[in-house]
Amino acid sequence: MAYLKQVDLLDPIDLAEHLDKVELYLGQVCRLAGISKMQLDYWTNKAQIPTKGKKQRIYDMDAVETVMLIKQAKDKGLNLGAAIDAARRFREQRFE
């Protein structure tokens, strides 16, 4: 009986509220997006995606989303320049 009362004290956790605190290393972003490290390096430079870290690049969730949007656009046939532009516009539209 005491167990049920303790469980009743808990509320559901919305992980989406905490995603802004999550950061991923380069290799993790590559696995998540399904791209190579060489691609990610190139895209990061071309799209000027901000990263943290000195020895290893660290990507916040905004950067990860940008990478995944670029990947999605490339998978749909856009060249890299157009994919970067599409990702930027998509993110800008969300915040208007």
Locations of regions flagged by a protein language model:
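Arg/Lys-rich, alpha-helical DNA-contact motif
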Residues: 1-31, 45-50, 61-96
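Key DNA-contact positions within bacterial/archaeal DNA-binding proteins
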Residues: 38
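Short, Lys/Arg-rich nucleic-acid/phosphate-binding segment
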Residues: 53-58
